[in-house]
């Protein structure tokens, strides 16, 4: 093991051995050996064993090391009890355990995948020539993936490399030239949309009409429906979303849990900001079902959830205990009433196959898309089916769903699982311009995969733009959207968090910019209309592309993301992994959506450390500031409507101070935005605004109308 791989342990040792609590600056000065620091001199810290251990590191490198430990939960940055404005760095229980049993360096190493570029033999080229009528238009790597006779194959397909086309073309090759029976071929995708797209492509070939195209869940659901009487002792069906809501309410009542108090305990003040109680209750409910699913797909009992309570702070213990009660009630209700969730489909199908191996369908060929996203239950299902030939397509660079149970190790360890397998890389990117491909290569160098090559030689517009405030940043993006003379559905605005998405969505509505919001919570596979901008979290946009992409909020707070919209999911995660490396891959996914124009924007002093020096050189060597023209265009957005919104926010702030209440209790931002959009002329009109009930109407109605009419 190289020394550098374990250096993080010395940071943990320093924090644990300090004679008193230290802040971030003092810690960094100690690690770098800054003897001019007054506190170091006064307390003789320069006599400590590890003083200056990182003196050969740059300040940025040491900061990155500390931030990585923070992001992986090994240290915490907490305010002093007696003075909340002073923060200190402390070891967490997880950090103390890491000192005794180091594992983080193994996680770092396990996210690397050292493979070479695919080699094409002369014999293979001759074969490609003989099938030119069928393979015309494909590159040599694609041709090899389509025609290879290996029984176990992994196709490492980079962003924009045409993986879906290759997968469907391989099926066509097998049925047309290899006498493969279509009904003995199963193609597995991850989404209904991908399944429909694949089925549509295959339907165009007369030899592929009987090929099974399924998602993991749809395949298992068909098995369950076919053998329901053997699996269950009563009729069962998949629970609807409406039923989930009812069951959640029953669980609250059954455990005497007040929804309002549960929300206040479960979510932080920042997480509650700008959300209604109804929205927060929905998030809590979704987390309950996610925890149940996480435990089921990992073959764990909910009883193990209790163990997590003992390993956390008091407030977290209470939340985990509450989560256990709700999850237990929900799961019990569903079992009693013959209701199944998506995780049950796979788990129950696996159990059935284990007990009834003669009912496992036999396939000559099985093809799996998005293999980097598989979880342990899906792998177990593949092992049980055990097809004669297995072809998997995946990209370790785009493994971003570890937080919901996916495991990158399955794609990284494919060769270990199948020693005689063939690994083929698709390294030509057909989506993005050359400069964008160069940029994304440099963003993910640590994964040790071959660089992607760009098929498109034209230059791209790459911009890293800094702003003084988030408001300026959003106004800049909107002004650019209004300038662009391309179909609006060729524009993506991507952000790391739902909060940023909601903020910019409100501004877009105010400007009359039609847009489609995509988030993980929405779970819908909609596509924007030709006159709609796509506004999305990065997790929800994977697999899609656009001419122009804005990645906003490129700061160290968002990439890697310090906050979580799902606090308990983070606490009770069954399998740990390197969160920072997944965040780095997430940033890669965001950048790789762009075809021609890429804007990375941020406010504050520095951009995310994921933008390294090599990336800066590709961009042009520096961060740019908005031009005078950009400032003027953004300034125009401060229209009459914006003035009214500002006046309403001032009124809300003053009212909140007068009544000693949080501003969001007076009125949510979205309610203020809707007031501006509806432009009510009297109090009666305010009745149609969501978020203004009878009490608020009576208390604030006249004041609001007065502000809108120019008074105060």
Label for each model-derived stretch:
Residues 77, 212-222, 366-370, 393, ...:
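Conserved helicase core region in the C-terminal RecA-like lobe
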């Amino acid at each position: 093991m190289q020394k550098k791989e374990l250096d993080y342990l010395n940071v943990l040792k320093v924090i644990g051995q300090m004679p008193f609590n230290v802040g971030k600056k003092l810690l960094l000065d100690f690690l770098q050996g800054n003897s001019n620091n007054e506190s170091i001199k006064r307390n003789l810290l320069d006599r400590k064993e590890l003083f200056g251990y990182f003196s050969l590191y740059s300040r940025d490198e040491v900061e990155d090391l500390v931030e990585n430990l923070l992001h992986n939960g090994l240290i915490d940055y907490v305010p002093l009890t007696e003075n909340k404005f002073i923060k200190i760095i402390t070891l967490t229980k997880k950090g103390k355990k890491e000192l005794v049993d180091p594992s983080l360096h193994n996680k770092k190493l396990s996210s690397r995948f050292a493979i070479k570029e695919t080699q094409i033999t002369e014999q293979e080229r001759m074969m490609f020539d003989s099938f030119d009528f069928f393979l015309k238009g494909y590159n040599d790597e694609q041709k090899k993936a389509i025609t290879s006779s290996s029984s176990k194959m992994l196709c490492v397909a980079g962003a924009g490399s045409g993986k879906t086309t290759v997968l469907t073309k391989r099926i066509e090759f097998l049925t047309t030239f290899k006498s493969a029976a279509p009904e003995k071929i199963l193609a597995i995708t991850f989404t209904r949309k991908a399944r429909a797209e694949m089925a549509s492509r295959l339907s165009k070939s007369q030899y592929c009409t009987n090929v099974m195209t399924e998602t993991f869940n749809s395949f298992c659901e068909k098995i369950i429906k076919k053998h329901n009487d053997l699996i269950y002792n009563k009729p069962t069906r998949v629970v609807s979303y409406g039923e989930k809501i009812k069951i959640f309410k029953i669980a609250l009542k059954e455990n005497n849990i007040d929804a309002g108090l549960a929300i206040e305990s479960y979510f932080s003040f920042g997480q509650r900001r700008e959300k209604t109680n109804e929205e927060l209750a929905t998030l809590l409910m979704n987390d309950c079902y996610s925890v149940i699913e996480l435990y089921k797909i990992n073959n764990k009992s909910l009883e193990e959830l209790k163990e997590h309570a003992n390993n956390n702070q008091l407030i977290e213990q209470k939340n985990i205990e509450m989560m256990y009660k709700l999850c237990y009630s929900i799961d019990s209700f569903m079992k009693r009433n013959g209701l199944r969730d998506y995780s049950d489909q796979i788990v129950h199908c696996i159990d059935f196959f284990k007990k009834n191996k003669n009912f496992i369908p036999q396939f000559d060929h099985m093809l799996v898309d998005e293999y980097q996203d598989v979880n342990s239950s899906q792998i177990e299902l593949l092992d049980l089916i055990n097809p004669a030939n297995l072809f998997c397509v995946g990209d370790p660079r785009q493994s971003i769903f570890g937080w919901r149970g996916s495991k990158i190790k399955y794609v990284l360890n494919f060769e270990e699982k199948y020693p005689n397998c063939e690994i083929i890389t698709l390294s030509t990117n057909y989506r993005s311009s050359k400069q964008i491909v160069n940029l994304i290569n440099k963003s993910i160098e640590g994964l040790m995969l071959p660089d992607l090559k760009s098929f498109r030689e034209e230059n791209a517009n790459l911009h890293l733009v800094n702003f003084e405030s988030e408001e300026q940043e959003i106004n800049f993006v909107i002004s650019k959207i209004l300038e662009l003379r391309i179909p609006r559905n060729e524009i993506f605005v991507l952000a790391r968090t739902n909060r940023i998405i909601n903020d910019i969505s409100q501004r877009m509505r105010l400007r009359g910019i039609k847009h489609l919001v995509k988030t993980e919570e929405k779970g819908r596979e909609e596509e924007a209309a030709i006159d709609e901008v796509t506004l999305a979290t990065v997790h929800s946009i994977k697999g899609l592309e656009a001419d122009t992409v804005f990645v906003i909020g490129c700061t160290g707070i968002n990439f890697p993301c310090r906050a979580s919209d799902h606090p308990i999911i983070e606490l009770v995660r069954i399998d740990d992994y390197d969160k920072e490396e997944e965040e780095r891959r997430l940033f890669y996914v965001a950048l790789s959506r762009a075809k021609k124009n890429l804007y990375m924007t941020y406010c504050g002093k520095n951009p995310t450390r994921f933008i390294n020096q090599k990336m800066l050189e590709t961009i042009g060597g520096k961060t740019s500031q908005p031009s005078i023209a950009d400032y003027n265009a953004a300034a125009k957005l401060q229209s009459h409507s914006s003035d009214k919104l500002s006046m309403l926010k001032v009124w809300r702030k003053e009212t909140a101070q007068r009544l000693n209440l949080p501003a969001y209790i007076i009125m949510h931002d979205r309610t203020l935005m809707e007031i501006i959009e509806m432009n009510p002329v009297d109090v009666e009109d305010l009745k149609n605004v969501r978020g203004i009930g009878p009490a608020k109407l009576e208390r604030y109605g006249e004041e609001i109308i007065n502000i809108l009419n120019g008074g105060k």
